[in-house]
Amino acid sequence: MHPMLTIAVRAARKAGNVIAKNYETPDAVEASQKGSNDFVTNVDKAAEAVIIDTIRKSYPQHTIITEESGEHVGTDQDVQWVIDPLDGTTNFIKRLPHFAVSIAVRIKGRTEVAVVYDPMRNELFTATRGQGAQLNGYRLRGSTARDLDGTILATGFPFKAKQYATTYINIIGKLFTECADFRRTGSAALDLAYVAAGRVDGFFEIGLRPWDFAAGELLVREAGGIVSDFTGGHNYMMTGNIVAGNPRVVKAMLANMRDELSDALKR
């Protein structure tokens, strides 16, 4: 196992334990609003602190980028740990048991290691560049769908960017006529992990942040899928507009989305 993957798994499991314990004692959870329709809890912060501490013990020189506390610049900026300590905070607050810890390691701009951990199901999704993706140690392969017929697609509503609401609904309408059904779970990290596992056939979302998808992106790629922006390019790291699935599913999704995209979403 890649040495950084070992530490990422250790950090994810420790954070997962913090999350699971607090899920059982909801009265101890303190939630606040940090932005429009965007929440944070004391549990997000506690899980993040555990992850940072675990990384720092082994790699004190590395840079860490987190959702809640921003960038912790290290002396080695070529290595970045990109962390979402609790992806699916709203689900957690509402006691809907679907959320995950997401940790990715990027070296010189390429994601090399990925972990997405679901503490409620004890499902550990891992990937190392060039070595495949796994779920609890078993090799993952994504969907073998040849087009959108019969597929289940996952998505997330653009609740932080409601200026795209009409465009988003139009895209959903276009895709829904071609696929079998949609799922909207509330955790982009798990959506991408589920694409890697073949539980859903494709995924798209508007305006994600790097910590939402950095780990999930590598899981998808290492399970035989591809990830692109809304025009089939690679600008999703900047825009957060992301489409994922096997090559044929992504091609079909992009073809259906194309005519509905505003200029802002074509970047």
From Swiss-Prot:
It is an enzyme of class 3 (hydrolase). Coiled coil: none annotated. Substrate binds at E67, L86, D87, G88, T89, R183, D212. It catalyses: a myo-inositol phosphate + H2O = myo-inositol + phosphate. Mg(2+) binds at E67, D84, L86. One of its GO terms (biological process) is ribosome biogenesis. Keywords: Chaperone, Cytoplasm, Hydrolase, Magnesium, Metal-binding, Ribosome biogenesis, RNA-binding, Transcription, Transcription antitermination, Transcription regulation. One of its GO terms (cellular component) is cytoplasm. Its cofactor is Mg(2+). Its EC number is 3.1.3.25. Belongs to the inositol monophosphatase superfamily. NCBIfam families: PRK10757.1. This is Nus factor SuhB.
